[in-house]
Amino acid sequence: MNPPGSSHTPRSDDGCILFVKLGHLGADQQQREVVDTQTTQWLQGMVPGLTVMPLMRQGLGSTLVRWAPKTYFNPHKHFGGEEIFVVSGVFEDEHGRYPSGSWIRSPHMSMHKPFSVEGCTIFVKTGHLLDN
């Protein structure tokens, strides 16, 4: 995440998917943060088979979530909405099946019952889609 006024030149030797959202940092989030997801420890999630890696130390929730095969989560609502990008595998809920590369945007107070039969890793951002 790059604060206003900063710059960068992204590159990749082998190609990649670059997920970019501009202009979303609050006044209290102006410091650049870097998380090395190859070395950061995964933490136990709220149900067996779920592990999480928080990506922001403050503010809204940005998290990597790893689902082991045949992991099921409780039905729940999202205060402030939720965005999901499926990094690998297949993520599912009662609304559909979302393979790697899928993006899901669910509005404030949306509800679902997520699971993954095959296993997956997703990027999740929550709480930033409040109604104006």
Predicted regions: what is each one?
Residues P3-D28, H108-N132:
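Ligand-binding loop in jelly-roll beta-barrel domains
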Residues P10-R11, L64-V65, N74-H78, H95-G96, ...:
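Short histidine-centered beta-strand/loop micro-motifs
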Residues L55, Y72-P75:
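Regulatory nucleotide-sensing modules
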Residues S62, G81, D93, M109-M111:
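A structural connector/turn signal
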Residues A68-T71, H78-E94, S100:
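Glycine- and acidic-residue-biased ligand/ion/polar-headgroup-sensing regions
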